[in-house]
């Protein structure tokens, strides 16, 4: 038996599945594309998470695009973090060209240019569906971790949240929380209420928390707090039997790692709380793709990394897969990397001693192969080629295969401004979430109370300046526009006691919210 025959005989059975799958590409041996070797990815194991890695310019983004398209073909929705701003073309039909024709002549696979259903989303002023969350939804523990508070300050934050809950002071955005902290620090009535009901708290501690909030605001955090909240079930949509590709445009968030980590962790928590337990399904409900994943872990405190690791473990049982896209596997903490079942490794470049160490570490993450010398081949993989290893339907790692990857069927370029406008204007979710809702919250209530105490009804503060609460001008995330925050929270509590208990143990338990007046 020749080497080629042996390669076909040993590899093909391991990538043959009984259930639903998609073909990611064809095997390559000694530089030759082998059409007989299909590299198939079982849909059943998509929720086992994954990694797409490789040096700049090796084709990671196109692989991500093709992967998402294949999921869409099978009615699976996805949420894609688009940090470089080059994935909007998924909404437009691709075009055949000579390079694509050559690729598909070699693979013997059909190629059908087509567009896919897309929703554009944003955390900022970018056009698209606005994603927001209320401060109450984050809760005191998660918010404290984001702010980098110590244990004592975290306890104080929990007391402040309890005070707001008891006094009917809804915390919608950071201006609400800042106003409460100022009230219980500087106002005699506020100080007395806090001391009588919850114990005396040093003004210096409250001031330290306030300064941490201001620091977070400087990273742009005001834009992710507010109303109306986004319902994560709106991510699980299909159109014409294709899964919707939800593209979150976060081009302007690259230099704000704390804000990025905050959003990712809160998103995972909300998905976990909202979706029912599902186990291993024939195909997942949702796949989340995090481009430039190193930004999540960059300078993140240890406790925040632990929370992300925990959520990656837990969310799989909800039928959700998480995929990290980055340059080298070493960008991902070992505790997270060990949980990633699907691995797609594009070329790495060994220009420096550090690069060579990263290559050595990367190769150690993959199964050994008698057909490839991975440490050498990984540096010479062509564009549109990658090492692939996945999990079969039994959860067993498949052999490492040098893979000639499929091309995206949608446009491999961005949408024009006019095309983006048309896409946004046609979106039902934009109409649902982009209306301004400015309900009465802690800021207004306390401001009115202080004005009444002063006996000055003409005080200029009675009308809150628009610029003082910019988040009120933007929609919010993770909380249905229907009903008050209190109703939603208790509803989730009744429906998901098990989820609530688990989230409480890891510090992400939802807190009850005061009703709006």
Residue positions per predicted region:
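Conserved ATP-driven motor cores of ASCE-family P-loop NTPases powering translocation/secretion/packaging/pilus
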Residues: 2, 66-68, 91-109, 310-396
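P-loop NTPase motor domains
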Residues: 68-77, 85-310, 336, 379-381, ...
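Flexible glycine-/small-residue-rich
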Residues: 26, 43-45, 54, 122-125, ...
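Long amphipathic alpha-helical segments used for membrane anchoring, targeting, substrate engagement
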Residues: 459-517
């Amino acid at each position: 038996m020749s080497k080629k025959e042996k390669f076909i005989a040993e590899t093909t059975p391991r990538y043959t599945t009984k259930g639903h799958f998609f073909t990611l590409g064809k095997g390559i041996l000694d530089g030759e594309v082998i059409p007989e070797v299909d590299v198939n990815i079982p849909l059943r194991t998509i929720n086992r998470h994954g990694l797409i890695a490789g040096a700049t310019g090796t084709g990671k983004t196109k692989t991500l695009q093709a992967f998402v398209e294949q999921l869409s073909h099978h009615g699976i929705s996805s949420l894609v973090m688009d940090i470089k701003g080059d994935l909007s073309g998924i909404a437009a039909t691709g075009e055949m060209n000579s390079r694509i024709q050559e690729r598909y002549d070699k693979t013997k696979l059909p190629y059908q240019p087509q567009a896919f259903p897309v929703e554009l989303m944003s955390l900022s002023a970018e056009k698209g569906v606005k994603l927001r969350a209320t401060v109450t939804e984050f809760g005191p523990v998660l918010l404290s971790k984001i702010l980098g508070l110590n244990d004592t300050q975290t306890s104080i934050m929990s007391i402040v949240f309890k005070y707001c809950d008891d006094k009917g002071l809804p915390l919608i955005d950071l201006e609400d929380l800042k106003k409460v902290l100022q009230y219980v620090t500087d106002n005699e009535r506020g100080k007395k209420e806090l001391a009588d009901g919850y114990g005396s708290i040093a003004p210096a501690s409250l001031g330290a928390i306030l300064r941490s909030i201001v620091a977070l605001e400087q990273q742009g955090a005001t834009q992710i707090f507010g109303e109306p909240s986004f319902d994560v079930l709106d991510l699980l949509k299909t159109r014409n039997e294709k899964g919707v590709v939800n593209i979150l445009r976060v081009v302007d968030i690259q230099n704000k790692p704390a804000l990025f980590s905050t959003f990712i962790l809160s998103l995972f928590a909300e998905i976990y709380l909202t979706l029912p337990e599902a186990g291993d399904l024939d195909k997942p409900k949702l796949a989340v793709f995090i481009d430039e994943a190193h930004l999540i872990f960059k300078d993140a405190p240890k406790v925040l990394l632990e929370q992300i690791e925990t959520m990656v473990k837990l969310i799989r049982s909800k039928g959700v897969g998480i995929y990290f896209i980055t340059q080298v596997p070493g960008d991902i903490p070992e505790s997270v990397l060990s949980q990633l079942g699907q691995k797609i490794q594009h070329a790495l470049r060994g220009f420096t001693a550090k690069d060579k160490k990263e290559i050595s570490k990367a190769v150690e993450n993959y199964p050994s192969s008698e057909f490839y010398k991975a440490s050498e081949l990984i540096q010479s993989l062509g564009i549109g080629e990658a090492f692939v290893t996945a999990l079969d339907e039994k959860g067993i790692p498949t052999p490492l295969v040098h893979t000639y990857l499929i091309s995206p069927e949608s446009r491999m370029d961005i949408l024009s401004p006019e095309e983006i406008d048309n896409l946004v204007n046609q979106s039902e979710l934009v109409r649902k979430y982009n209306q301004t809702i400015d309900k009465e919250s802690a800021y207004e209530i306390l401001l009115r109370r202080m004005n009444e105490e002063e006996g000055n009804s003409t005080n200029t503060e009675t009308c809150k300046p628009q610029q003082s609460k910019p988040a009120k001008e933007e929609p919010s995330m993770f909380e249905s526009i229907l009903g008050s925050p209190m109703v939603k929270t208790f509803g989730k509590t009744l429906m998901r006691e098990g989820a609530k208990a688990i989230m409480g143990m890891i510090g992400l338990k939802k807190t009850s919210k005061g009703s709006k007046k």
